[in-house]
């Protein structure tokens, strides 16, 4: 469950290390984002010589949450951290690699590229 001001780890090699959610996209009163939702983020910590720099604003898709995601069979998939993958304006991933596992809920038309790059899909 991601809301405004939430700090997330970045699960790609775009150069950002940590980002902060500044808006949950999808409706004017929308408060929370979960796995697979698109959020607007500001880069808070970036690696030197990376593709992004501190202060940049990007779209991102949430790939892991500590709150978890409930499956129709009743299983609950939780993670140790909240993580996101940075996206460009066409909603394509900025990085060329994905670090850590992602959930099967990302297997939609929009995020198949992220699923194919991920080392593990839960």
UniProtKB/Swiss-Prot annotation:
Which GO biological-process labels does this protein carry?
translation
Please list the GO terms describing molecular function.
large ribosomal subunit rRNA binding; structural constituent of ribosome
Superkingdom of origin organism: Bacteria
What keywords does the record list, in alphabetical order? Ribonucleoprotein, Ribosomal protein, RNA-binding, rRNA-binding
Tell me which Pfam families the record gives.
Answer: Ribosomal_L14
The signal sequence is none
- Identify the GO cellular component terms for this protein: cytosolic large ribosomal subunit
Name which cysteines form disulfide bonds: none
InterPro entries this protein is in? Ribosomal_uL14, Ribosomal_uL14_bac-type, Ribosomal_uL14_CS, Ribosomal_uL14_sf
Q: What does this protein do?
A: Binds to 23S rRNA. Forms part of two intersubunit bridges in the 70S ribosome.
Listed NCBIfam families: rplN_bact
HAMAP family, per this entry? Ribosomal_uL14
Q: Give the free-text miscellaneous remark of the entry.
A: Present in outer membrane vesicle formulations which are used as vaccines in human.
Q: Which family does it belong to?
A: Belongs to the universal ribosomal protein uL14 family.
Q: How does it assemble?
A: Part of the 50S ribosomal subunit. Forms a cluster with proteins L3 and L19. In the 70S ribosome, L14 and L19 interact and together make contacts with the 16S rRNA in bridges B5 and B8.
From the Swiss-Prot or TrEMBL record, give the protein name.
Answer: Large ribosomal subunit protein uL14
Q: Which organism is it from?
A: Neisseria meningitidis serogroup B (strain ATCC BAA-335 / MC58)
Q: What is the lineage of its organism?
A: Bacteria, Pseudomonadati, Pseudomonadota, Betaproteobacteria, Neisseriales
